Design a protein with these regions (language model features):
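Generic alpha-helical hydrophobic packing signal
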Residues: 21, 27, 43-47
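Short aromatic-glycine-(Arg/Gly/Cys) micro-motifs in beta-strand/loop hairpins
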Residues: 4-23
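Compositionally biased, intrinsically disordered low-complexity regions enriched in proline and serine
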Residues: 18-21, 34, 48-49
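A short, exposed loop/beta-hairpin motif centered on an aromatic-Gly-Thr core
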Residues: 24-35
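Short, charged, surface-exposed hinge/linker loops at domain edges
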Residues: 1-6, 38-91
């Protein structure tokens, strides 16, 4: 078993909660915060199980920006998460 710290954003959209991690480009939802977090753990487990089963773990993680450090995989570091106001050409 490998333990990895993943950055996770929890968003609320109407009555659903969305859990998203940019380092795996993976998301899931739940009816509340707790369910979104629980489902996130499940989807990460499934994601890694499938990569190992298919033999594509290294390839996919490299494509997502992960680096191999000896016997471990290290995710890219999220250095900022913030709200930014932008103007879009929609009237």
């Amino acid at each position: 078993m490998l333990e990895i710290k993943l950055p996770v954003s929890i968003l609320r959209e109407d009555k659903k909660y969305i859990a998203y991690t940019p380092v795996l480009d993976l998301s899931t939802s739940g009816k509340d915060y707790k369910e979104a977090k629980s489902r996130f753990e499940e989807i990460v487990d499934i994601f890694f199980e499938e990569l190992v089963k298919k033999g594509t773990l290294g390839e996919v993680l490299q494509d997502l920006g992960w680096k191999r450090a000896r016997t471990k995989w290290v995710p890219p570091m999220v250095i900022s998460q913030e709200s930014q106001t932008v103007e879009v050409p929609i009237s």
